[in-house]
C-alpha cells in the first residue's frame, strides 16, 4: 500500500511539473518572423528613414544625411552623404522627408530648425539653409503645386507652425512667402497629416486634433492619454495610432463622437516611440526592446505577433513589401513572414 502511495505521489508530482512547463512554454503558432534582407552600415546612428521608389534617405545622426539606392535590394549603393559640417549644422539629424514631385529634401537638426536641401539638379545636394522655429520636434511637408510647398511643424514652443515657400525662377531660389502659428493645448512633440486632418502629440497632455478647411485650420478636440504621447501615425481620415512611450500604444478615431468608442490600448508593457502601419501589419519601435509586431483583429482588439531584438530601434517604415528599421546598428531591411 505504501509503495503504491509513493508511486502515485511521484506520478502526481511529475504531472504537476509537466503542466507548469506546458503553461509557460510560448505559443509560437501566431508569431510572425522577421527575415533579414540586408543590413546597411550608416556610420552614425540611423535615426530615421524615408523611402521614395529606389531612393532611401537616411537621417544618420552625427553622420548627417545619406542617400542610398536600393535598385538591387540586397546590394544597396551609397550615392552621396552630407556631414553635419557640410549641412551647416551642429546637432545630429533626427528626421528626413522627401517631396518627390518637386525634388526637395528636408531634414531636422535635433531640437532645432528644419533644413532644406535642393535635389532638382540630379544627385547634387544643394543646401538651401534652415527655416521655421527652433525647438521643432517633427514636421510634415505638403506640396501645393510644382513651385510651392508648405511645411507643418510641431513647434515645442509655439504649437502648430506653418511655413509656405515658392520658387523664383529669376533667382533660382525658394522664398518663404507666408506662414503663421496656431496655439496648441500643450507643447507638441509629434505631428501627422491625412487629408484635412492634422494631429499633434502633446507629451503628457495626449493629443490634439485639428481640421483644415479652405485654408483655415481650427482645433477640434484634445484627448488626454496615459503615458507620454510621442508620435502619431494617421492611416486614413478616420483612424490613427499614437505611441505613448511607457504606456504602450493607442488606436483612436478622428470623429469627436467616436473618441471613446474607438479607443484601443495595446502593447501596455512596452516602451513605444513610433508605429508604422501596413494594412494588417503594425511595427512598433520600442527603443532598447527592439521591434514589436502586432495585428489588428477587426475594430475591437489588436494582437501581439512577436518582439524581435534587432538592437535599439528609433523608427520603422513599410515600403514595397519590406520593413525598414532605423536602428543604432544601422538601417535594417526585413520581410515579415506571417
For the regions a language model picked out, list residue spans one by one.
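Repeated scaffold domains used in trafficking and secretory/extracellular systems
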Residues: 44-50, 90-98, 133-143, 184-193, ...
Amino acid at each position: 500500500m505504501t509503495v503504491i502511495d509513493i508511486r502515485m505521489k511521484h506520478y502526481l508530482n511529475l504531472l504537476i511539473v509537466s503542466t507548469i512547463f506546458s503553461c509557460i512554454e510560448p505559443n509560437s503558432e501566431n508569431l510572425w518572423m522577421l527575415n533579414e534582407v540586408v543590413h546597411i552600415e550608416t556610420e552614425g546612428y540611423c535615426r530615421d528613414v524615408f523611402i521614395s521608389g529606389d531612393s532611401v534617405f537616411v537621417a544618420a545622426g552625427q553622420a548627417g544625411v545619406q542617400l542610398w539606392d536600393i535598385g538591387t535590394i540586397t546590394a544597396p549603393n551609397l550615392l552621396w552623404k552630407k556631414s553635419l559640417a557640410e549641412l551647416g549644422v551642429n546637432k545630429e539629424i533626427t528626421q528626413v522627408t522627401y517631396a518627390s514631385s518637386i525634388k526637395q529634401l528636408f531634414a531636422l537638426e535635433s531640437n532645432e530648425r528644419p533644413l532644406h536641401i535642393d535635389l532638382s539638379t540630379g544627385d547634387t545636394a544643394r543646401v538651401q539653409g534652415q527655416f521655421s522655429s527652433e525647438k521643432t520636434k517633427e514636421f510634415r511637408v505638403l506640396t501645393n503645386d510644382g513651385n510651392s510647398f508648405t511645411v507643418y511643424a510641431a513647434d515645442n514652443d509655439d504649437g502648430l507652425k506653418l511655413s509656405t515657400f515658392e520658387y523664383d525662377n529669376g533667382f533660382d531660389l525658394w522664398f518663404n512667402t507666408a506662414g503663421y502659428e496656431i496655439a496648441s493645448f500643450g507643447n507638441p512633440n509629434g505631428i501627422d497629416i491625412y487629408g484635412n486632418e492634422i494631429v499633434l502629440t502633446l507629451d503628457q497632455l495626449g493629443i490634439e486634433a485639428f481640421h483644415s478647411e479652405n485654408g483655415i485650420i481650427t482645433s477640434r478636440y484634445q484627448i488626454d492619454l496615459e503615458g507620454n504621447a510621442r508620435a502619431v501615425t494617421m492611416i486614413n481620415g478616420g483612424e490613427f495610432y499614437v505611441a505613448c512611450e511607457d504606456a504602450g500604444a493607442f488606436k483612436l478615431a478622428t470623429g469627436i463622437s467616436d473618441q471613446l468608442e474607438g479607443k484601443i490600448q495595446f502593447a501596455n508593457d512596452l516602451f513605444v516611440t513610433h508605429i508604422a502601419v501596413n494594412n494588417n501589419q503594425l511595427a512598433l519601435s520600442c527603443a532598447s526592446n527592439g521591434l514589436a509586431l502586432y495585428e489588428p483583429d477587426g475594430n475591437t482588439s489588436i494582437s501581439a505577433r512577436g518582439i524581435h531584438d534587432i538592437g535599439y530601434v528609433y523608427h520603422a517604415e513599410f515600403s514595397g513589401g519590406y520593413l525598414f528599421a532605423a536602428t543604432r546598428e544601422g538601417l535594417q531591411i526585413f520581410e515579415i513572414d506571417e
